[in-house]
Every structure is written in structure tokens, then in C-alpha cells.
């Protein structure tokens, strides 16, 4: 029991020590998408990048996809040159785990429009960024720095009716950043289902 407590304390302290901070360089990664293509953060230097942690079985994620909110954001910003990477970190056997073909079918059915859907079943990318919930959003600027992390909006509910009345932190941050303005709200508390790591 004592060893378990010490191990837990070490994990908490390690996570706190290496927690991402706004303005820090975003951690480098390479991941494979649902079509088998590799994506490296380094390849997108000079572009804004959005990382969206998702889980199609999570009611909070469902809220943003059934309302069309997430797809609308994806289309709006990828049309402006933003790279939008949806990340699936659910482990095999856990809620939200998808094979490549299952994810491609889901993306088509949901009319989703990310640049790519990255498969992260071992949770390596999720742990690298400290992704806690679905959705959990991160924005990286063209210089490779983290400029926003947290919730998608200010209504932490599963109610689709709340979407039109919400302040969308991601949309606001991207609008400000792509206009050359400082991002006013750089970090918020993410809400949603916990990421289903093993």
C-alpha cells in the first residue's frame, strides 16, 4: 500500500513538473492516421494546428458532433489553412476505441472534416500533451508554441441546446491568433469524459 501511495505521488509530481505551459514549445510527435499516413508536428511548422481529443461514445463529444458544431469548426478553419488533427486515445476495449476502418466510417457518417484523425491506442500522444477529457482542445501557433489549451466552450454540459449560446474558446482564440492579435483566454478547464487510457 505504501509503495502504491509513493508511486501515485511520484506520478502526480511528475505530471505537475512536466505540465505544458502556454508559450512553451508544443511537444514533437509523429502519429499515424486512420488512412495509414504519418503526421509529424514538424511537418506543419508555419501553420496553426488544432489538436482535438475525441471519443464518439462520450455524451460531451456527441453534443458537439450531433449539433454540427465540431464539423463546422473543422470546415471553417481548415479552409483557412489551419491543420485540424482529431486524436483518438481510447485504449482497445475502452469506450471510444476505433479501428482505422471504424473511424473512417464514423467520419463519413458524421460528415466530419478534420485534416486527419490520429490513432493513439497506446495513449502516447495523449499523455505527451496531458489530454484529460473528450473533448480537450489544444492550439499551436506557426512558431510551434502552445497558445491555447482547455475546453471547447464555456458550457460544460451535454445539452445540444447550449451550443448556440456558448462562447467557443477555440473559435475565439483562432480568430484572434490568425489576425495577429494576442489570445485573450489562453487556458480553461477542459470538460467531458475522461480520456480512456489503459
Model feature map: region roles:
Residues 4-13:
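Sec-dependent N-terminal signal peptides
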Residues 19-27:
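Cleaved targeting-peptide boundary
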Residues 13-19:
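Sec/Tat signal peptide C-region and signal peptidase I cleavage site
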Residues 29-49:
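A short beta-strand-turn-helix
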Residues 42-63, 174:
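Short active-site neighborhood of thiol/selenol oxidoreductases, capturing the structured segment around
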Residues 62-110, 121-128:
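Structural microenvironment flanking redox-active thiols in thiol-disulfide oxidoreductases
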Residues 104-141, 146-147:
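Short, internal strand/loop/helix patches
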Residues 139-198:
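Thiol-/selenol-based redox modules, centered on thioredoxin-like
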